[in-house]
Structures are given as structure tokens and as C-alpha cells.
């Protein structure tokens, strides 16, 4: 019923005059479906999974006011509300956003599922720097010979928790600067403060990429510090290379061989645990053990890139001595079909 309602609403064309300028009020319906098969080579076990079934609705009410609402009907089998915000753009280059959103932080963690290069996200994007929250941001884009985009915001700092009775006296923020340099180069710097429990967590991220002539080369480093020395600082790295090979008169429009290295030290999610359960009488524990990973693979594009892709990856994990690997964080072969509409 929800999908049917979205589709009916999106199919209704509406327009309005705004200061003499015609505004298309027709809502735009988008979606991303990712179905995959994974086989863990050491355990000899496999599984099918719907990783995402996202549906979003966005549009404009006036030339100043826009909106977006996005849900995931199957985020590893769970329904989640992802984005729900209103955006105001009073003048060119300046925008104000309020609601629930992905915070402006990092490069890889800010990618939507259809924009990912690999079937499974990097450690930065999945464990260390993946934060959605409720708050407000201010963004400003300008040009100094090359484009610059600045974003900063204040948030609850607790993630997507029960918002009804959540109150805080903490200032939780995120800030990000992107420099779109000539010849396909980009430098991105960002920082974020959160407080998921009783300990403040500061994160600092620096990354750069080159995107031109079929190449995408990217490297990113994230440093995560816990207040009151509650947990050792976390270091995380993500680096990868992808090259597009266009094809003609073929089922695929291009193929893209790619390789990635990522690493993370022992990581805590910032919550206190006692006897394996969240408990305010406990302390911060290791939720993700130190590991590195090599990922190699090929992406087959059936249409435009990031519209209909088949991602074939192999992941090789390297854990530190004494580490405990989670059931789904082991050597595996992954075949994923991604469709964006």
C-alpha cells in the first residue's frame, strides 16, 4: 500500500507560478534494489540477501522550498526511515536543511547504495563513520576558480533513536568542506562530534580522489577519539582504484575492474555494555575487532553507471591475533545485482 500510494502521488503532475517563474511540483519517485548472493569460502556456507529496497520521494514546492522522504523496506531485513527533511534555498548557493538525514561527514560513508563501487561498504562507511541523525545543516557553495562546498550542522548526536523523549544539553555537530579542483581532483575534509551514550566522541576525516578518463582513484583516513580515555582511539583507512572499460555492441555498456584495501583498529560504538548487553552500569567494549581487508572484483554495467550494475567481488580478511570475527565478516565471494530507478 505504501508503494502504491507513493506511485499514485508521484504520477500526479502539478505546477505553480513562483514570482513569475514556473515551478514543477511533480514529486519524483526513486528507488534502489540490491539483491545479492554471498558465499563464505572457509565455512562453505552461502546465503541470498536483499540488502536494500529503498524508496524515496522528493520534489519542490516553490523555487525555494524542496523536500525528501526516504525509507528502506529491507535494510538487511528491517524497515528503516532514512531521510525526512525540508530544504530551503533562499539565494543561489545557500541552503538550509532540517530533519532526519545523513550527516555531512566523510566521502565513502556519504554515498548512497547505488553510488557505491563495491558490493559491501568500506569499514569507514559501515562501522566507523556511518551516522544518520536528526538536526539542521547550513550549506554554502561558491567558486574561487574552482567550486567549493561548505556544510555544517547541529544534531541530536544520538543517531536514529526514539526522538519523542530525547533531550540533550550537548552540542553535537558535523562540518565538511569539499574542494572540487581542476582535472578531476577532489579534496574533502570533515569533522564530527557525537555522544551516543555518556562519552563524547570526536571524529576527523581527510580524503581525496581523482575521477577522470575512466579512472577513479580514492584514499581516505578517519581518526576517532573517545572522551575521558574511555576507549583507545580508532584509526581507519579506505583506498581503492577503479577503471572503466567501455564496450560496444555488447550486453554490457562497460566493465570496471577494481581493487580496494581498507583497515580499522579495534572499534567501539560508544555505548556501554555489561554481560554482552547495553547497560549504563557497564563500559565501552570492542564491537568490531581490528582487521584489514583486500577486495578485488569487476562491475558489469547494463546501462548507465550506477543504474543497473552487477558487482562481482572477492573479499579477503586479515584479523589481529585474538580477534573474534563476526559471522558475516569473513572471507567471501559476493555477487550483487543493483537496480536504480
Where are these regions (language model features)?
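Compositionally biased regions
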Residues: 6-7, 16, 175, 187-189
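Active-site cleft segment of glycoside hydrolase catalytic domains centered on the general acid/base Glu
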Residues: 163-167
Amino acid at each position: 500500500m505504501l508503494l502504491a500510494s507513493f506511485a499514485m502521488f508521484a504520477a500526479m503532475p502539478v505546477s505553480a507560478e513562483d514570482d513569475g517563474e514556473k515551478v514543477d511540483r511533480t514529486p519524483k519517485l526513486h528507488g534502489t534494489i540490491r539483491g545479492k548472493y554471498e558465499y563464505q569460502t572457509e565455512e562453505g556456507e552461502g546465503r541470498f540477501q536483499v540488502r536494500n529496497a529503498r524508496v524515496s520521494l522528493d520534489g519542490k514546492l516553490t523555487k525555494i522550498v524542496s523536500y525528501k522522504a526516504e525509507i528502506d523496506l529491507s535494510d538487511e531485513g528491517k524497515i528503516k526511515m532514512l531521510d525526512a527533511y525540508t530544504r530551503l534555498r533562499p539565494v543561489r548557493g545557500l541552503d538550509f536543511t532540517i530533519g532526519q538525514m545523513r550527516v555531512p561527514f566523510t566521502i565513502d560513508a556519504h554515498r548512497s547504495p547505488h553510488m557505491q563501487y563495491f558490493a559491501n561498504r568500506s569499514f569507514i562507511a559501515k562501522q566507523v563513520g556511518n551516522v544518520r541523525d536528526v538536526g539542521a545543516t547550513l550549506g554554502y557553495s561558491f567558486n574561487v576558480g574552482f567550486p567549493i562546498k561548505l556544510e555544517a550542522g547541529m544534531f541530536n548526536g544520538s543517531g536514529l533513536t526514539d526522538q519523542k523523549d530525547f533531550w540533550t544539553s550537548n552540542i553535537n555537530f558535523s562540518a565538511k568542506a569539499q574542494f572540487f579542483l581542476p582535472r578531476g581532483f577532489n579534496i574533502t575534509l570533515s569533522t564530527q562530534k557525537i555522544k551516543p551514550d555518556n562519552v563524547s566522541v570526536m571524529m576527523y576525516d581527510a580524503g581525496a580522489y581523482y575521477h577522470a578518463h575512466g579512472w577513479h582513484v580514492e584514499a581516505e583516513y578517519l581518526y576517532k577519539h573517545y572522551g575521558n580515555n574511555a576507549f583507545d582511539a580508532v584509526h581507519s583507512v579506505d583506498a581503492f582504484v577503479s577503471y572503466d572499460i567501455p564496450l560496444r555492441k555488447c550486453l554490457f555498456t562497460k566493465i570496471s575492474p577494481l581493487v580496494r584495501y581498507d583497515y580499522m583498529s579495534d572499534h567501539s560504538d560508544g555505548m556501554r555494555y555489561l554481560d554482552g548487553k547495553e547497560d549504563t552500569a557497564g563500559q565501552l567494549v570492542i564491537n568490531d575487532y581490528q582487521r584489514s581487508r583486500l577486495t578485488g572484483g569487476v562491475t558489469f554495467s547494463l546501462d548507465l553507471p550506477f543504474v543497473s550494475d552487477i558487482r562481482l567481488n572477492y573479499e579477503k580478511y586479515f584479523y589481529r591475533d585474538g580477534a573474534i570475527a563476526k559471522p558475516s565478516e569473513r572471507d567471501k565471494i559476493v555477487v550483487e545485482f543493483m537496480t536504480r530507478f
